[in-house]
UniProtKB/Swiss-Prot annotation:
Residues 1-52, 65-129 are annotated as: Disordered. Plays an important role in membrane trafficking through the secretory apparatus. In complex with CCZ1, acts as a guanine exchange factor (GEF) for Rab7 protein family. Promotes the exchange of GDP to GTP, converting it from an inactive GDP-bound form into an active GTP-bound form. The active form is involved in protein trafficking from prevacuolar compartments (PVCs) to vacuoles. May serve as a linker between Rab5 and Rab7 protein families in PVCs and mediate PVC maturation. Residues 43-52 have a biased composition (Acidic residues). The gene is MON1. One of its GO terms (molecular function) is guanyl-nucleotide exchange factor activity. Keywords: Endosome, Guanine-nucleotide releasing factor. Belongs to the MON1/SAND family. One of its GO terms (biological process) is vacuole organization. It is found in: Endosome; Prevacuolar compartment. InterPro entries: FUZ/MON1/HPS1_longin_1, FUZ/MON1/HPS1_longin_2, FUZ/MON1/HPS1_longin_3, Mon1. This is Vacuolar fusion protein MON1 homolog. GO terms for cellular component: endosome. Interacts with CCZ1A, CCZ1B and RABF2B. Residues 7-19 have a biased composition (Pro residues). It comes from Oryza sativa subsp. japonica.
Amino acid sequence: MDMDPPTNNPSPPGPPDSPPPEKRLASLSLRTSHLPPDFEIHDDYDDDDDEGYLTAVSRVGSISTSASAWKDDLEDADVAPPSPSSSGYAAERGTSLASSAAANDDPQPQPDDDDWPRDKKHLHEDDTSASWRKRKKHFFILSNSGKPIYSRYGDEHKLAGFSATLQAIISFVENSGDHIKFVRAAKHQIVFLVKGPIYLVCISCTEESYEGLRGQLELMYGQMLLILTKSVNRCFEKNPKFDMAPLLGGTDAVFLSLIHAFSWNPATFLHAYTCLPLAQSTRQAASAVLQDIADSGVLFALLMCEHKVISLVGAQKATLHPDDIFLLSNFILSSESFRTSESFSPICLPRYNSMAFLYAYVHFFDENTYLTLLTARSDAFYDLKDSRSRIQNVLLKANVLVEVQRSLRESALRIEDLPADPSSQSVSPPPQFSQDLHFQLLSSEMAIGGPAGLWHFIYKSIYLDQYVSSEFPLIISNPKQQKRLYKAYQKLYASMHDKATGPHKTQFRRDEDYVLFCWITQDFELYAAFNPLADKSQAIKVCNRVCQWIRDLENEIFVYGESTLSW
């Protein structure tokens, strides 16, 4: 329900975002009888769990196998990017460079058994398989002629008939002069996204909102554009029956990584990026060396640790959208070839320019930390290689890489570290309270997850397009519990930003699992989860303390003032 906003706005002012008005939704309703008889929901069948919960960045198979087909097909369609092969190196789709050395002489550690699979699973399944129909969440990409391009489960070729059915539904509605957005059938929700000749569909019974599922389809489309650019549409203009699946051959790992991120990465719905906590002097040292590469023609330079930004530098008047950062890091981290050798690969940043290729030079300094240099020049490999060498030397001398590894181990925000309320510290316990009772009260408070029952929070700076989140406490250490909380945050976000009933400033929800509190101002958004027995007034006080805590740490947890290259 709505309520008056808490007092004490501790965040620095910044211009609020004003999203464009949303178009009216067009929905259809199907009866349960319209679904196949064995297309049912099994509450104990968790398709995400049987593939493992993504707790670390995967190191899965190389996507270099599709290089020749990708290049040849686009050349036939007259939409090929400028070929980088003229520079004397092999650099298509992240393949290893002929002249490059390994990024790290140490052997790569093997993924844990819990890590998500190296390749698509359940290839034996199709739409006639009972196990396929029990999956809680499907994703499909198909062309406007009904040809399958990608599916999360099963072999795309075996799902040609199912893809044709989805295409027929979309065409039927469009022929009547309307546009289909979603269909509800029993507990299933089918969400459609039409992008020219490309159709994206999600079939889900996870109780996620329409807005959340549509946002996930938008990210899948963006990931596809990052690999191919929007100019692939010209292929369909020349041949409506063009088969695009070979162009994405070998990219299953990229899409699997993206789909798993929908269950753990707040960037997928906040449209913001997170930074690695670092001392201000360390981050400034990293930014300074990235700025000093003007002679190499770099548009953007990113130093990252896993999916967290260490430093970001861009050319003047050039900005990098958080979604582009997320999709680029997902592409790099899910491709093993980037980890094993320095690479130079054509990519597209859909929010920057969806019609053009840039070229990404990628080099891993260690297992987690990597440098990405983006340029418009197809012959810039050797210049960027020299720039990387200079950057690496400075980072080593300034101990930046050492501090990055230390931060990765030690700098997580923990609820237990939230500073105590100064007003409560000045009040002494009544003398009639025994020490045992006082200790019992303190223990009960900490046992439920932190001060006043706070379990977890996510804080987004609207002005900076950055977010920070706390570490999960022991009480939410189970992956299923974490995914459940993440989905609760997604629903809360969708509710707060619902244009039909909102936007809202605050919301306080209580259910059997959590108390969820959201507070939105022109400067920040705060999402917090409390013990289900938490008191509303105490929760508000704790949220004020969290915001003050974030303000005290802002120079360490945020990147302030995106630096520009010294051109």
